[in-house]
Amino acid sequence: DALLNATKDITRANANGAEQFIAVQLTAKEKSCLVAGMPCNADLCEYAAGYYDKLPKALEQLIQQGGVNDQGHIEAVAKQHQVCPFELSLDLATWSDLIIGDYNYIFDPVVRLQRFIAQPNIHLLVDEAHQLSPRVQSMLGVEVTSLEIRAAKSCSNKSMSKSVLSLERAIKKTAKGLAQGEHEIIQTVSLDRAVTKFLENYEHPELVEDREPELEALYFACLGWARGASWFEKKRFRYLVEVKEKSIQVRQICLDAGHYADQVMSEYASTVRFSATVSPLNIYQQLHGQVIHEARFSERARTPFSSVQTHVIIIKDIPTYLQQRPQSLPKICTLLDTLTISKPGRYLLAMPSYAYLEQFRYVYQGRSSGAAQSPEFFYQERGQNAQAQQQLMDAFTAADNVVMAVVLGGGLSESVDFGEAKLSGVVIVGLGLPPPSLERNLMAEFFAAEAGAELGQTMAYNQPAMARVIQAAGRLIRSPEDRGVICLVDPRFERRELQNFFPSYWQPQSIGLNEVKNSVNSYWLHDMKARED
């Protein structure tokens, strides 16, 4: 939404320009479909039938109008001319000055748009660039599961039964002799052969009379697996098999997406990556495959913010290790009471898990703060849908003295802007480290071998954790006029390897809980005097 609004601002600024400015927002086919559940078949869908006959008038209307063509506008014109809105947006994109879309249109090797590949006149603007590496890693990951095979086996016709049974035998072979849990395996030759045979049979029109949904789902899983077998440098991938009581899952995982991301970005004239969370730069350059280009081609924009805008304090005497969390709860309550009494306002509290958040909620709501008027308290619930989250946001922004507890790394702690409802502070409890896993340990081993032992732990565990921390903290300072307090609750934030991820304008102070009152009072008093001057 922020990018779309910025595009509209550009359009308004260009209103008197000599040339018409055209922008288009690409929306996923499933979300833009005007007939829910309708197959993409010209014999069945009125919006697909005769598409290219009806396209010229629809396209002409959009080009003549210019401006920003968001999902709503594209759908309105598509209905008027009875054409598919998704295909219309793609065709309009070739006439547009600016195209807004998800990463997958450029980076996903399966669904990336062929019309935009290797276009030297196109410049990439990559928003939320701290998400680029994990997103591309997920795009390069493929899997086949016994549950998909079993579902297809129960409904497939005779012409496919032999191929499905071969898949079932092959996936069982990958797990032979393995205990329940996740394991690394060296090769998947038997599964690869079974997948190839299944695809050959499925794609042979004489062998398939009726392609049931379960069979189709297995087909796409196998197609992804087959494509993944030929992707890029094998040293950056590993095979994992997870054995459960009633299922087997075989995955090909990507440990390092940087090399592929670099290949994609090099196809275009330039790439600008946007994020407030790209420190230290060498880490993100490594993740994005840009280390080899850094000396000649990379430049970093200077931050528009200054150290006087925020007071960053590390609370060094509230450890948040799992076994110490019960003892931390009353101390976190005291910290919030101190902040809200010193400066009533809106405070965001980010915690590393729902379980920890729920424990805190019971303690916080049951205590007496000692304040004349306690702040309102809202919290993010497990499994909240988008509508419920928006209602929570609306209630939070409407209040003047309020604390909202959210989960670190969730939709309410990243990529959200509170607009005119400015925050007075953000409190981040714990590091939010990813739980140990075989996949992350393999990633740590890979980067340790490639770039040194210290980088392994950093890439696999510290970077994803600190990206979430800095994103949550970034909800506070959104413009040069904003002011506020950031509290990092955990003595581990004193470590140099974690402080390397802090923005350059932060000047953190490490203090105890009993020092917070004087520290924040001094900051707000100094800020008030500076504004008066």
Which functions belong to the PLM regions below?
Residues 1-99, 107, 169-179, 194-208, ...:
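A substrate-engagement module of RecA-like helicase motors
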Residues 5, 81-98, 103-200, 273-290, ...:
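Signature of the SF2 helicase/ATPase Hel1-core->accessory helical subdomain module
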Residues 1, 272-274, 345-352, 356-357, ...:
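Conserved RecA-like ASCE P-loop NTPase motor core of nucleic-acid helicases/translocases
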Residues 442, 452-453, 457, 487-533:
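N-terminal targeting/trafficking signals and adjacent low-complexity tails
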Residues 316-327, 382-492:
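Conserved RecA-like P-loop NTPase helicase motor core
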Residues 262-263, 317-352:
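Conserved interdomain hinge at the start of the Helicase C-terminal
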Residues 74-96, 110-116, 204-319, 326-328, ...:
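A contiguous, basic/glycine-rich beta-loop/short-helix subdomain that forms a polymer-engagement track
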Residues 352-381:
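Conserved helicase motor "Helicase C" RecA-like lobe of SF1/SF2 P-loop NTPases
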